[in-house]
Amino acid sequence: RDEVTRNGLTIVNGPEDHPQAVIQGWYPEMTWQMMAEVSYAVEAGATYFVTNRDLTIPREMGIAPGCGSMIRAVITATGVEPVASAGKPEAYMYDEARELNASEGHDLVPKESSIAIGDRLDTDIEAGNRGGYDSLAVLTGVTNPTELMLAPEHLRPTFIARDLRELGEIQSEPVRCEDGTWECRKASAWFENGRVQVSDPTSMDGLRAAVCAAWEAADKGAQMDESMVPNFVLGEQ
């Protein structure tokens, strides 16, 4: 509320005040009544903005509904899609981070020297792709190896890491061999008989190779699904 006020907007108490716009964001104490009031205002013609559309959020006890799940409830009730989102998968947040860093007396970091990092393909990684950033998907949250192998082009990261500790390591780059096999150091993967095969389903290098093999098969027209990719059980680092 303070941020909205500082930007010259006036906050009203509810839909009975006929707001011109509604901003819905993540609020863990969100109630049915609050979502209903958003719906009433949107139905009455208020422009609908949201802060982010993450459907789920990792919590200590497991995966919980995120802001996007609450937004879907309003969309279902009103039939109205938000006109814009300040959060991912839009790239504004990454652009703003670079500009904020520059406003503190530092040089503006060019996009080619920046990297978008996250555990969600449909927000963190898609935002990086939309904004022209390299991206790193980490496996410490929502995304799992199967989802990586089945990712459509707009959700594919530049790099894959087990966790943030690998930021300090040089990533091994998968290489495509003449026979169509993808090799990543000692691991290899290939597409054969309608399925991705991998030499080592316990290593990150095996996953990197398998991801490349799966993406190549999909790009060539294979209708990829879970039955066509290996099950990874990554060993301890």
Q: Residue locations for each model-derived region?
A:
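Asp-based, Mg2+/Mn2+-dependent phosphohydrolase catalytic module
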Residues: 1-237
